[in-house]
Amino acid sequence: MEYQSSVENLDEDGYTQLDFSSRNITRRSVVSEKGLCAASSHWRLIAVTLGILCSVMLVITVVLSTSGIWRSSSGNNLLKSDSFPSRNKDNQSQPTQSSLEDSVIPTKALTTTGVFSSSCPPNWITHEDSCYLFSTLLDSWDGSKRQCFQLGSHLLKIDSSKELEFISRQVSSQPDHSFWIGLSRRQTEEPWLWEDGSTLLSNLFQIRSTVTEKDSSHNCAWIHVSDIYDQLCSVHSYSICEKKLSV
């Protein structure tokens, strides 16, 4: 049997035939398998890399979306809070008694012609039986009236020519400013009344008119230097508060 196998491998001249074809096929199959493994590893690396990139992009997208929603919600809440201010905010904007009493005219007239008394609150000056506060808070006539009320007083009421002279000395050092007093009227044709409802004495002083053709509703009064003028009640100006001297 061995002899027959050897004979089959001999050619016509008696040389042995080598089976190179089977070996070549085996080598090619091995090379092909190695190539497939290398290619598979290469694509697997690419797939893993792409998967990681997609995951990162997904995380970034989620974070940005969440941030955008939070900012939008915050913006809406801010608009709501600005559009509908709370009552506390309005209350905080109101002047306190301390700020009202501190807002006095810092002039020489106050220290030379006015007298500070322990019977009056700080920054108030004394004249006869009354205390006076010359406020530098700019407000309308109604607003100034409320400020004085908060301090337990009222807008200035002039009862005599002597009191008018005293007040004129205090405000004459402020020629650029006018001061609301407690004199007003409901209509142009109606009489001038003080806050307590009493009428203005005709022989005490005359009210100078500032009425123009465009606007005739000057129904509040202020003092400028030594004269009294009518004026629009909505105009913002300084004011004078008065209250009786404490015994």
UniProtKB/Swiss-Prot annotation:
Topology Extracellular: residue spans: 66-247
Positions with biased composition (Polar residues): 81-101
InterPro entries named among the record's database cross-references: C-type_lectin-like, C-type_lectin-like/link_sf, CLEC7A, CTDL_fold, NKR-like_CTLD
Short sequence motif ITAM-like: positions: 15-18
Tissue: Detected in bone marrow, monocytes, macrophages, dendritic cells and natural killer cells.
Positions of the C-type lectin domain: 127-242
CDD domains: CLECT_NK_receptors_like (cd03593)
Sites where the protein binds (1,3-beta-D-glucosyl)n: R146, Q147, C148, F149, Q150, L151, G152, S153, E195
Localization (cell): Cell membrane
TM stretches of this protein: 45-65
Record note on modification: Phosphorylated on tyrosine residues in response to beta-glucan binding.
GO MF, any single term: metal ion binding
Protein name: C-type lectin domain family 7 member A
Organism field: Bos taurus
